[in-house]
Amino acid sequence: MAFKDVFKGFFAYEDEEVYVEEQSDKVREPAQKKVVKETYVPEKKVVRTESFQKQSKPKMKVNEEKVTKANVVNMHDDIVNVSSKVCLFEPRVFSDTQDIADELKNRRATLVNLQRIDKISAKRIIDFLSGTVYAIGGDIQRIGQDIFLCTPDNVEVAGTITEMLEAPEEENE
């Protein structure tokens, strides 16, 4: 008879399966009324040998959430922490603009004074710096007459300068 019981566990009869479903439905109804959070999940281990099957005691397994640290490191973090400088430039020729662009690429804010250069070269410099600032995701702002502040993406400028600075410029032209 024990041999028959072993195979009974392997093969489910339809009559018994229907009976088990009816029984499990009755058991589930009261369980649906209660809300219980379990942190343990039972894990059954089945050991099979040549002539018989036996079940070991269910072990409790703890559900753990592992916190993994990201392996990606931002290369610009070191530069941001080291350099918090504002570079001042007063270009005399257009070729000085490349030095300003290099400082912007190194994530440093630059203040550009264009008072000692002719208007045509000043416009070319501002056009070049506008493209540089756009490429690095930064910003360019007019601070005063012929003075501009160029900032990379890691620098925020708070506040605005009033529009009164434009009035004297219009009168001079």
From Swiss-Prot:
It comes from the Bacteria. One of its GO terms (biological process) is FtsZ-dependent cytokinesis. It holds the Pfam family SepF. InterPro entries: Cell_div_SepF, Cell_div_SepF/SepF-rel, SepF-like_sf. The keyword Cell cycle applies. The keyword Transferase does not apply. Belongs to the SepF family. This is Cell division protein SepF.
